């Protein structure tokens, strides 16, 4: 067999071709590896960039929320200044610019999302009674105040309307002693309510001659003392100035000292609570093992004995299943724990909580009926003693008999020499 030799030139060419193929494969592999590595790096870069964007957005949201919190804290004060109106306006404008997510981040010393966000009713139903053209005779109704719109209109407004109906020849006007609340209502609802100085200045500017100040306060406590001091500074601006009694009248010497005012209040609030609960009588409620607890605010003032006197009054009336308590636990026997113990020892299994306050505002909605662990409702439930705990969120001011008691106090002041 003849073997045809392969020319040397072809052998070298074939080798070069194989070499080129190997080089090409190597280059392709390298390119693929670099591509894969570059791809992974690109995704990592994108992830990092995305994270940074999210963090920047979160920081921006918190910054906007913190700004509003600062503006709210600035108006959460008891003193009115020349800047108050502008501060109230600025706080609301800043709040309105926030997104829903940003609003949830608002948190300050006193600021929270509820300051502007909580629905407390229609502010337009409330009359701030701050107009001029007062005339010579004015009844200035002074309240601590509340930012709860419905309660302000029904409870404080209820007393004011009753007084205006009873004394058509007098002009009824309003003042709040809590500037914190005045600022809250103004900032949120653009409703302007006079503080004591503003109301008294308005009376002077309108030429009022005879001024009767009717406080809606429960007792002769710290708020009542501050009221009398403020009025004293304007005493020489009017021909006559008279301050009527608070709801419970004179304090008395000890916890056994009761009076006609306390008896009238005890009867009125108990009757209203029994009716609201659907019972024919207090005795009928007792037979079903139901007790009523009226929760007041409490105070460190010497007038705190008024709460003990109200408990004495309930007992004097034979209201064995009615108890008095206070948020502050002053006096001590009105603290929540003490009241729970009293009901437990008496064997009551059903409890109805109702505020002993002129308005059903923050204390009634949160401290009494709220869902937090420290609310009265929650503490009664946590005790494990009772089968049911119900709440009645209604202020004293909406009860007709209470309104008429204020009317009587105003008449007594008018008649006083």
Residues of each region from the PLM?
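Extended amphipathic ligand-handling, pore-lining, and cofactor/metal-binding catalytic surfaces
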Residues: 112-352, 357-417
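Bacterial lipoprotein signal-peptidase II cleavage site
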Residues: 37-50
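Serine residues within intrinsically disordered or low-complexity segments
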Residues: 9, 14, 49-50, 57
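Bacterial N-terminal signal peptides that target proteins for export
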Residues: 17-26
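Hydrophobic core
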Residues: 28-36
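Acidic/polar, low-complexity intrinsically disordered N-terminal segments immediately downstream
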Residues: 52-73, 130, 134-136, 143-145
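Short, Lys/Arg-enriched N-terminal segments with co-localized hydrophobic residues
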Residues: 1-18
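Beta-rich interaction/scaffold domains
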Residues: 57-120
């Amino acid at each position: 067999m003849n073997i045809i030799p392969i020319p040397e030139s072809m052998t070298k060419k074939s080798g070069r071709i194989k070499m080129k193929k190997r080089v090409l494969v190597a280059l392709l592999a390298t390119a693929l590896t670099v591509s894969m590595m570059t791809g992974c790096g690109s995704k990592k870069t994108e992830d990092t960039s995305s994270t940074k964007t999210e963090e920047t957005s979160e920081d921006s949201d918190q910054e906007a929320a913190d700004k509003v919190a600062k503006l709210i804290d600035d108006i959460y004060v008891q003193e009115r200044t020349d800047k108050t109106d502008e501060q109230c306006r600025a706080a609301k404008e800043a709040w309105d610019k926030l997104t829903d997510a940003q609003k949830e981040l608002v948190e300050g010393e006193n600021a929270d999302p509820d300051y502007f966000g909580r629905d407390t009713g229609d502010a337009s139903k409330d009359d701030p009674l701050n107009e001029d053209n007062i005339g010579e005779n004015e009844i200035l109704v002074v309240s601590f105040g509340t930012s709860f719109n419905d309660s302000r209109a029904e409870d404080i407004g209820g007393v004011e309307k009753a007084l205006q109906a009873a004394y058509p020849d007098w002009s009824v006007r309003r003042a709040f002693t809590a500037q914190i609340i005045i600022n809250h209502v103004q900032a949120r609802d653009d409703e302007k309510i006079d503080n004591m100085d503003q109301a008294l200045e308005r009376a002077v500017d309108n030429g009022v001659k005879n001024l009767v100040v009717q406080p809606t306060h429960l007792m002769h406590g710290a708020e009542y003392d501050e009221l009398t001091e403020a009025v004293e500074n304007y005493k020489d601006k009017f021909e006559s100035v008279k301050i009527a009694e608070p709801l419970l009248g004179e304090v008395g010497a000890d916890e056994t000292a009761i009076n006609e005012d306390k008896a009238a209040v005890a009867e009125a609030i108990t009757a209203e609570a029994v009716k609201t609960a659907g019972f024919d009588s207090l005795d009928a409620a007792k037979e079903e093992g139901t007790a009523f607890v009226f929760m007041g605010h409490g105070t460190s003032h010497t007038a705190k004995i008024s709460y003990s006197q109200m408990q004495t009054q309930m007992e004097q009336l034979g209201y064995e299943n009615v108890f008095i308590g206070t948020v502050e636990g002053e006096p001590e026997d009105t603290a929540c724990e003490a009241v729970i113990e009293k009901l437990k020892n008496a064997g009551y299994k059903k409890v109805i909580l109702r505020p002993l306050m002129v308005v059903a505002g923050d204390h009634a909605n949160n401290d009494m009926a709220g869902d937090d662990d420290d609310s009265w409702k929650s503490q009664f439930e946590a005790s494990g003693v009772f089968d049911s705990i119900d709440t009645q969120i209604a202020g004293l001011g909406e009860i007709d008999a209470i309104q008429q008691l204020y009317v009587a106090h105003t008449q007594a002041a008018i008649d006083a020499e």
